[in-house]
C-alpha cells in the first residue's frame, strides 16, 4: 500500500523531470479523475508533458471475475474463540484507534502534498513563461532554473520519507530528570525548531510495565489542538530509547513560581487557578483524566500563560506498585498519634511544610510520590471519575494562598494521617488574630473541590458559574494580561529550570538517580521488546524544511512546502 503510493508520487516526479521549456502549454485535465501519462517524445524529438488520460472503469464481467478471485483466494475463516475478548481489550482498542488516525493522516498528508506540488509547478511554469516572454530569457537559462526547482522538490520528497532520529537534534542543555529518563532543551538541525526532548529508557519502561503510560502520553499529545496543553512535535524510537520532542515551555513550572513567591495575592491565585481549570478541562474533553495533578505539571509559557503537561498517568489507572505503596502507608498511620491538626498556626504550618520539602529533599520527586494533591479515592484504589482532578486543583488553590497544602504535616506519615481523616483535618485557616485567611467564596470553592465525590462539583460549567470566578472572563482568559511574564534572553533560555551542572540542584534528584541505577542493574538486555506499535509521529505545522523557489532572488514561501 505504501510503496504503491510512493510510486505514484515518483511517477509524478518523473513526469515533471522530463518537461522542457520549448512548449509550456500544459493541457488541463478534462475531469477530476484524469491522470497523466509518462512524458513522451513529440514528432520533432522534443520531450513534452504527458497528456491527460481519463479514468475508465473495468467491464462488469471483469469485475465479477475479480470478485470471484477474491472469494476463492480469501475464503473466510472462523474467528478464534477469544477474538471478541481480545478485541475489547484497551490495548487492542488503542492500536485500532492509532491505526485509523495514522491512515487518515497519511493519506490526507499525501493528497495535500500532491495538490500543493502541482500548485507550485504551475506557479513556477507561469514565472518562467513570463521570464521568456517579457524578459526574453534564453531556453538554456530557463531549463537551468527548472532543474533547480526539480532538485528542491526531490529534496522535499526525500525528507518526507525520512523518520526522525536522535542525531537530527542538537542537545543544548538538560532541563529535567525523571525516573525513566531525561528531558533536554534541543534544536532540530534542519529546521531550527526548539523543543523539549524527552528521552526514555526502553529497558526500564518494559521492566516496570510503564509502556502504556508512555503510549497514552504520546496519544494525548498528538490528539490535542488546544493551547492549554503542551503539543508534541515528534515521536520516534530506537532499540534503546523512546523519544518525545515537545514544544518547549520556557517559563518553568508552577512549583518554581510558588517557591519564589511563597504565597500569591488573591487576584493572582484566581488567575492561575482559572487557567488550570481551562487546561484540565481541555484534557477532560479528550476523554482523559490526569489523576496525579500537582504544581509541577503546569508550565508557564513565554507569554505568562499556563500549559498542562506530563500525561503519563492518564492511562486509566495509576500503577499497582504506587497504589499498593500508598495504601500500605495509609494503613501504617492508622493507629499513630499526632498533634492536633488545628493547633498549629498558619505560619507554623507554612514553616513545617517548607522545612519538610527541604529536609526530605526527594519528597516531591520520589517514584512513589506524595499524597498532598491526590484524591483519597485514588489512593485507596477505589472507583473514581474525572472530578478527582478537581480535588487536586482545590489543594493547589489552598497552597497558593497560605503556602502549604491542606493536609500537610511535619512528616510524610502525618500527611497520610491527615488525608485519611480529611473531613476532620480540612479546616479554614485563620490568622493569629483569628481572622479567616480565605474569603467566603474562596472557601466555598475549596470545599466544593475537596469533597466527597457526591458533593464535588461535577462539570467545568458548574465551576465557571461559582461566585469565586465572577471577575474572570473565560472566553478571553488566554489573551488577558498575566501576573508574571518570564524574562527571557532568547528562545533557548532555560534559566527557569534546574541547573544540572549545579550540585545543589542535582541533590534534588539523588533518590531518582539511585533508584534508576538500581533498576538498570536489574534489567537484562533481552528485556527490551520489539518496537512499540503506532509510536512514531511527525507534526505538520511550523518549519519542517523548505522547498522555496527563488523568484527574482527572493524565496517564495508556499504554505504546503513544509510537508515532507
Swiss-Prot record:
Domain AGC-kinase C-terminal: 470-547
Family of this protein: Belongs to the protein kinase superfamily. Ser/Thr protein kinase family.
Modification Phosphothreonine occurs at: 536
Cleavable signal peptide: none
One annotated GO biological process: exit from mitosis
Top-level EC class as recorded in UniProt: transferase
Chemical reaction(s) catalysed: L-seryl-[protein] + ATP = O-phospho-L-seryl-[protein] + ADP + H(+); L-threonyl-[protein] + ATP = O-phospho-L-threonyl-[protein] + ADP + H(+)
Enzyme Commission code(s) on record: 2.7.11.1
One Gene Ontology CC term in the entry: spindle pole body
Domain of life, per lineage: Eukaryota
Region named Disordered: 24-62
Provenance organism: Saccharomyces cerevisiae (strain ATCC 204508 / S288c)
Other notes: Present with 3320 molecules/cell in log phase SD medium.
Function recorded in the entry: Is probably a Ser/Thr-protein kinase that may function in initiation of DNA synthesis and also in late nuclear division.
Listed name of the protein: Serine/threonine-protein kinase DBF20
Active site: 292 (proton acceptor)
Binding positions (ATP): 175-183, 198
Modified residue annotations for Phosphoserine: 17, 366
Keyword terms: ATP-binding, Kinase, Nucleotide-binding, Phosphoprotein, Serine/threonine-protein kinase, Transferase
MF term (GO), any: protein serine/threonine kinase activity
Residue ranges of domain Protein kinase in the record: 169-469
Amino acid at each position: 500500500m505504501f510503496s504503491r503510493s510512493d510510486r505514484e508520487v515518483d511517477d509524478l516526479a518523473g513526469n515533471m523531470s522530463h518537461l522542457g521549456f520549448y512548449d509550456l502549454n500544459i493541457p488541463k485535465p478534462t475531469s477530476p479523475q484524469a491522470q497523466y501519462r509518462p512524458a513522451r517524445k513529440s514528432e520533432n524529438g522534443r520531450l513534452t508533458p504527458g497528456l491527460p488520460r481519463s479514468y475508465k472503469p473495468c467491464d462488469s464481467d471483469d469485475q465479477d471475475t475479480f470478485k470471484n478471485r477474491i472469494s476463492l483466494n480469501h475464503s473466510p475463516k472462523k474467528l478464534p474463540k477469544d477474538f471478541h475478548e481480545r478485541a475489547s481489550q484497551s490495548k487492542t482498542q488503542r492500536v485500532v484507534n492509532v491505526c485509523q488516525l495514522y491512515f487518515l493522516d497519511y493519506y490526507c498528508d499525501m493528497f495535500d502534498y500532491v495538490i500543493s506540488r502541482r500548485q507550485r509547478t504551475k506557479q513556477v511554469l507561469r514565472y518562467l513563461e513570463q521570464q521568456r516572454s517579457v524578459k526574453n530569457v534564453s531556453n538554456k537559462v530557463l531549463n537551468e532554473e527548472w532543474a533547480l526547482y526539480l532538485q528542491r522538490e526531490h529534496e522535499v520528497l526525500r525528507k518526507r520519507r525520512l523518520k526522525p532520529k536522535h542525531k537530527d537534534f542538537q542537545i543544548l542543555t538538560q532541563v529535567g530528570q525523571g525516573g525513566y529518563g531525561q528531558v533536554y532543551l534541543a534544536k532540530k538541525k534542519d529546521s531550527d525548531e526548539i523543543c523539549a526532548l524527552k528521552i526514555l529508557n526502553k529497558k526500564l519502561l518494559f521492566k516496570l510495565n510503564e509502556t502504556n503510560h508512555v503510549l497514552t502520553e504520546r496519544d494525548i499529545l498528538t490528539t490535542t489542538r488546544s493551547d492549554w496543553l503542551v503539543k508534541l512535535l515528534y515521536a520516534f524510537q530506537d532499540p534503546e530509547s523512546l523519544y518525545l520532542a515537545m514544544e518547549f515551555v520556557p517559563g518553568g513550572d508552577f512549583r518554581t513560581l510558588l517557591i519564589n513567591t511563597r504565597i500569591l495575592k488573591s487576584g493572582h491565585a484566581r488567575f492561575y487557578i482559572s487557567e488550570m481549570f481551562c487546561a484540565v478541562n481541555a484534557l477532560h474533553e479528550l476523554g482523559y483524566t490526569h489523576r496525579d495533578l500537582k504544581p509541577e505539571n503546569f508550565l508557564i509559557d513565554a507569554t505568562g500563560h499556563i500549559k498542562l503537561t506530563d500525561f503519563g498517568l492518564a492511562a486509566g489507572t495509576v500503577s499497582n506498585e504506587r497504589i499498593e505503596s500508598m495504601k500500605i502507608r495509609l494503613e501504617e498511620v492508622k493507629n499513630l498519634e499526632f498533634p492536633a491538626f488545628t493547633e498549629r498556626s498558619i505560619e507554623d504550618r507554612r514553616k513545617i511544610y517548607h522545612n519538610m520539602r527541604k529536609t526530605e529533599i526527594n519528597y516531591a520527586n520520589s517514584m512513589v510520590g506524595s499524597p498532598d494533591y491526590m484524591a483519597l479515592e485514588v489512593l485507596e484504589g477505589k472507583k473514581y471519575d474525572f472530578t478527582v482532578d478537581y480535588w487536586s486543583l482545590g489543594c493547589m488553590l489552598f497552597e497558593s494562598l497560605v503556602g502549604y497544602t491542606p493536609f500537610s504535616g511535619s512528616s510524610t506519615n502525618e500527611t497520610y494521617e491527615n488525608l485519611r481523616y480529611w473531613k476532620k483535618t480540612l479546616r479554614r485557616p485563620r490568622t493569629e488574630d483569628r481572622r479567616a485567611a480565605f474569603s467566603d467564596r474562596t472557601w466555598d470553592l475549596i470545599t466544593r473541590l475537596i469533597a466527597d465525590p457526591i458533593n464535588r462539583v461535577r462539570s467545568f460549567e458548574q465551576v465557571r458559574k461559582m461566585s469565586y470566578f465572577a471577575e474572570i472572563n473565560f472566553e478571553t482568559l488566554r489573551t488577558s494580561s498575566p501576573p508574571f511574564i518570564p524574562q527571557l534572553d532568547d528562545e533557548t533560555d532555560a534559566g527557569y529550570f534546574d541547573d544540572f551542572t549545579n550540585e545543589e540542584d542535582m541533590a534534588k534528584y539523588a533518590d531518582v538517580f539511585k533508584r534508576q541505577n538500581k533498576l538498570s542493574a536489574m534489567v537484562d538486555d533481552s528485556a527490551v521488546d520489539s518496537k512499540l506499535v503506532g509510536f512514531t509521529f511527525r507534526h505538520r505545522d511550523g518549519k519542517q524544511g523548505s522547498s522555496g523557489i527563488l523568484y527574482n532572488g527572493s524565496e517564495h514561501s508556499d504554505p504546503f512546502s513544509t510537508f515532507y
